[in-house]
């Protein structure tokens, strides 16, 4: 099933985001049950439900009265679903990559400067610094 089709089926729940920390769960949030080295997100379903979550993303069917999206790989599905919830913002990005032996940082900063002068929002990711284009 495509993510957009799934979101259409979830429309009655008013989904606005997805979280994997039960303390951030609430109405409109899908709670993703991620298994970690020390904790299992499935153990926190009740806490998420108490905070108002009505949809969970898990890797097996659980005995709870909650809408369940059951997938093999919760982590991978969560990322793709989060992108779909946010209308796939990555599809609207233009990315410029600079490679080579010398001059990459200088070229990146000059390119950024030109784009900013043209009022084109621009971020920059480098070895030691990153700018998101907002701050």
PLM features: residue spans?
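Phosphate-binding loop of NTP-binding sites
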Residues: 77-135
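N-terminal leader/targeting and accessory segments in enzymes
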Residues: 1-80, 84
């Amino acid at each position: 099933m495509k993510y957009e089709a799934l979101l259409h089926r979830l429309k009655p729940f008013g989904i606005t985001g997805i979280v994997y920390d039960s303390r951030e769960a609430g109405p409109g949030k899908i709670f993703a049950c991620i298994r970690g080295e020390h904790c299992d997100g499935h153990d926190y379903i009740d806490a998420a439900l108490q905070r108002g979550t009505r949809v969970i993303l898990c890797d097996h069917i659980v005995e709870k009265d909650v809408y369940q999206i059951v997938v093999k790989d919760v982590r991978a599905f969560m990322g793709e679903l989060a992108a779909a919830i946010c209308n796939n913002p990555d599809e609207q990005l233009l990315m410029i990559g600079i490679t080579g032996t010398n001059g990459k940082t200088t070229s990146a900063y000059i390119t950024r400067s030109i784009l900013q002068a043209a009022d084109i929002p621009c971020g920059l990711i480098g070895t030691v610094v990153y700018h998101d284009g907002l701050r």
